[in-house]
């Protein structure tokens, strides 16, 4: 056979294949729509299902469904992290801001949520790339004196956070079950048993998902409760509320700035940084195990995510946390402030507003059920926040000083320290003093925030820390190829990150100066 004849036969085969493909497509369209023109979407789906012909829409549809399925596998940590932003401390600061300035500090609530989402994205990036949480990274890269200093600050933040959970839960128990405050404070230590039974970070994914689902249900109850309360409270025009999300001169007044710093401290919680960087490893490890890249040994402390797993998981993890914070956390915090602004603003009780008084006013001016819904939301917030505070405390102690204390014992110690000031205040001055302790704990958290975020900023901007080495084999030569992948922040994001950190630091320095001068708020 001549060369020319050979190529002619190949050309005929190609033409025949093309004609056959087009005939299949035409036949499919005719079968689908014998009498009238159908939509392109239906045609494309039929071609894909019946003949296996890939079309533009079918490829796009497959890509979307695949992305949604993969995203659903990462749902869970966002709910645990969101709990840190809707704890009883937020009730106190948002209640104070709403009663004094109505809706004008909603801008700070929104800004705080933006900061929280951005800092959480850094935490997830750090935890995913290094395979270690923020505390463990500090132990790996700092000397023990610096590490112990950060550990002490982190423990103070955990205790200050726990104080808010204790007070919120005790107040809710008194409202709902008429349990005395002192007894309610003592009862809060019982949640240690629930955490001991439920939380198994080194266990199977099923046990982790069960715990995440339980906390997610608590978060949903809080959100639904406030949705109902918002529907029953007269908040004025929607324009007035939405105007509060715009910057206002009130933010820069002395009283407004103090409330703003309190909101920042209550929203951008320091212990949430350890949660965000520590919760991602479970899913990364599970994915590497299923792909055959890692075999669990002991407590899995030697685990480091592969580049393939990091590349696949990083975006899903960040999006999952961002959606959780922008939906549940932002909605709940805004709702608390809006309800307080609608009920307390320009009233005689604005200066004495606390968790008890907002319950009384809701019960008197709206309905008894509305007041009880508020108390239910407060109770579930305190419970769920107490659970995740236990997890954060465990990450802190194990990461900074390698203190492998049993979770229940560590929880007993932390909660025992936290309930001491609450017991003293509740026994001495009753409910009037608890609100002051609650507000002070949130300001304390705000002061600690710049110190605990500094290592996070340093690590995520460092090429040395944020690099991953991957090995592959050249198929032709069989040689080992080693590649280094840089996940550190670029110049633009580095500037943004340091700008946020400097902003938070400047606010807290101003607060410290005012407190040192004895300025009253």
From Swiss-Prot:
Mitochondrion in keyword set: no
Membrane topology, as annotated: Multi-pass membrane protein
Key words of the record: Endoplasmic reticulum, Manganese, Membrane, Metal-binding, Phosphoprotein, Transmembrane, Transmembrane helix, Transport
Localization, UniProt: Endoplasmic reticulum membrane
Gene Ontology, cellular component aspect: endoplasmic reticulum membrane; plasma membrane
Pfam family name, one: Nramp
In-chain residues carrying the UniProt-annotated modification Phosphothreonine: 43
Transmembrane intervals: 71-91, 104-124, 152-172, 179-199, 210-230, 233-253, 260-280, 325-345, 373-393, 417-437, 440-460, 495-515
Function text: Transports manganese ions into the cell. Regulates cell morphogenesis through control of manganese homeostasis.
Family note: Belongs to the NRAMP family.
PANTHER family: MANGANESE TRANSPORTER SMF1, SOLUTE CARRIER PROTEIN FAMILY 11 MEMBER
Protein name: Manganese transporter pdt1
The gene coding this protein: pdt1
């Amino acid at each position: 056979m001549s060369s020319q004849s050979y190529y002619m036969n190949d050309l005929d085969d190609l033409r025949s294949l093309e004609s056959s493909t087009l005939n299949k497509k035409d036949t499919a369209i005719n079968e689908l729509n014998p009498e009238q023109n159908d939509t392109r979407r239906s045609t494309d789906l039929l071609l894909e299902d019946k003949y296996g012909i890939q079309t533009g829409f079918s490829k796009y549809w497959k890509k979307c469904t695949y992305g949604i399925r993969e995203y659903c596998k990462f749902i869970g940590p966002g709910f645990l992290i969101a709990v840190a932003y809707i704890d009883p401390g937020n009730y106190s600061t948002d209640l104070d801001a709403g009663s004094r300035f109505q809706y004008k500090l909603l801008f700070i609530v929104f800004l705080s949520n933006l900061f929280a989402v951005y800092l959480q994205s850094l935490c997830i990036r750090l935890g995913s790339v290094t395979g270690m949480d923020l505390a463990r990274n500090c132990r790996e890269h700092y000397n023990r004196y610096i590490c112990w200093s950060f550990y002490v600050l982190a423990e103070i933040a955990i205790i200050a956070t726990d104080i808010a959970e204790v007070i919120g839960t005790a107040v809710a128990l008194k409202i709902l079950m008429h349990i005395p405050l002192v007894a309610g404070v003592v009862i809060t230590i019982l949640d240690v048993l629930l955490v001991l039974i439920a939380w198994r970070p080194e266990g199977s994914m099923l046990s982790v998902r069960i715990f995440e689902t339980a906390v997610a249900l608590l978060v949903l109850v809080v959100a639904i409760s406030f949705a109902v309360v918002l529907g029953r409270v007269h908040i004025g025009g929607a324009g007035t509320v939405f105007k509060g999300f715009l910057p206002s001169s009130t933010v820069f007044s002395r009283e407004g700035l103090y409330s703003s710093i309190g909101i920042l401290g209550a929203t951008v919680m320091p212990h949430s940084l350890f949660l965000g960087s520590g919760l991602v490893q479970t899913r990364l490890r599970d994915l590497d195990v299923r792909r055959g890249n890692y075999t669990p040994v002991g407590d899995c402390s030697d685990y480091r995510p592969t580049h393939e797993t990091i590349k696949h998981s990083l975006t899903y993890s960040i999006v999952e946390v961002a959606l959780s914070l922008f939906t549940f956390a932002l909605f709940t915090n805004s709702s608390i402030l809006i309800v307080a602004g609608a009920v307390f603003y320009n009233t005689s009780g604005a200066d004495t507003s606390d968790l008890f008084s907002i319950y009384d006013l809701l019960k008197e001016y709206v309905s008894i059920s509305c007041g009880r819904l508020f108390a239910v939301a407060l109770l579930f917030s305190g419970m769920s926040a107490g659970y995740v505070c236990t997890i954060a405390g465990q990450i802190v102690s194990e990461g900074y000083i390698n203190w492998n204390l049993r979770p229940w014992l560590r929880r007993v110690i932390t909660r025992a320290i936290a309930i001491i000031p609450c017991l003293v205040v509740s026994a001495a001055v009753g409910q009037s003093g608890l609100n002051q302790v609650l507000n002070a704990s949130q300001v304390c958290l705000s002061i600690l925030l710049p110190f605990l975020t500094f290592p996070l900023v340093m690590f995520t901007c460092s090429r040395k820390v944020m690099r991953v080495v991957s090995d592959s084999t050249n198929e032709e030569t069989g040689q080992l190829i080693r590649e280094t992948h840089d996940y550190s922040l670029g110049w633009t994001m580095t500037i943004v990150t340091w700008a946020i950190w400097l902003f938070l630091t400047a606010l807290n320095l101003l607060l410290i100066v005012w407190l040192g001068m004895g300025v009253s708020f």
